[in-house]
Amino acid sequence: MNAAELERYLHERIPLSRAMAIQVRTAGAGGVQIYAPLAPNINHRDTVFGGSASAVAMLAAWSALHVRMRAEGIDPRIVIRRNAMSYERPITAGFTATSAPPEHEAWTRLVATLARGRPARVRIMARV
């Protein structure tokens, strides 16, 4: 799944991504980078709304796993169980969130668990 295909998928399946005007800059085995402009994600202080920053980070992490699973022939059913984010400073312009799929060991464990028909968990980080 390339960047254009992922962006189309997100806009069709996750309507919030279209409302936030996200653009997928890169998508591949190495990870995903998503850009969001300021205007549709602005708050009352003329900076990025914290919920928008969190949503774009989650989209990047979810997408990195989704792209990798599809590349491996796994039909993904991904659910975000927990999300935590630290806000270190206001974001005053369009911004990107970047995420990579799990490292080799975590990926191998995830695939093995899914192959046994069991629910699996994996931790994925995103950086805004």
Name each region found by the language model.
Residues 1-35, 39-40, 74:
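Non-catalytic linker/capping segments at the edges of enzyme domains
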Residues 18-22, 81-87, 109-111:
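Short structured motifs
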Residues 19, 31-33, 82, 94-96, ...:
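Intrinsic-disorder/low-complexity, polar/charged segments enriched in Ser/Thr/Lys/Arg/Asp/Glu/Gln
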Residues 27-30, 90-95, 128:
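A short, structured loop/turn motif at beta-sheet edges
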Residues 35-62, 74-75:
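Hot-dog-fold acyl-thioester-processing enzymes
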Residues 60-64, 124-125:
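Short, well-ordered amphipathic alpha-helical segments that serve as non-catalytic structural scaffolds
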Residues 64-105:
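Hydrophobic beta-strand-centered segment that forms part of the acyl-chain substrate-binding groove
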Residues 92, 102-128:
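HotDog/MaoC-like acyl-thioester-processing domains
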